[in-house]
Amino acid sequence: MAAAAVLAAVPAPAHAARPHQSQDQGNGTTVVVSLSLSKYTAVKAIDAGSTVGVKPDVIRVHVGDSVVFVNDDTDHHTATSLLNAATFVDDPRWTDDALRPNGEIGPGFWSTGDLSPGQRSAPLIARKPGTYLFGCFFDYGAGMRGEIVVEP
């Protein structure tokens, strides 16, 4: 079973700093990301635009690492990729595919699927270096967005 660092409890040094993580038994580390509009209410500015409700808002991982999203809120959330976006777009034009777990972190479509309150996503493996933006299917308009930076 993979060990995971819960990042909500780790003070964020720099907004894009790679946090301390435990080595898992797979190919890399597992990073846990918290989704909650009620806990993380401060709007933050990152390179891609403004974000709220995601801790940390910028996640740094390496190829082979995995990211697990946890819904720490009382409402449903997703973490769903924004295809080919360098900044947060006004309308991501997602379909209901965002409500089903799909894909791996990389240039293609990926999503945690619909996460109920308290639910953890399946691990999403980072497969290709790059910067990947994501948002919540339900609360994108409220600013629930983030960025994953995958390093070699």
Give, region by region, the residue ranges found by the protein language model.
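Bacterial N-terminal signal peptides
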Residues: 2-9
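Extracytoplasmic copper-binding redox domains, predominantly the cupredoxin/blue-copper superfamily
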Residues: 11-152
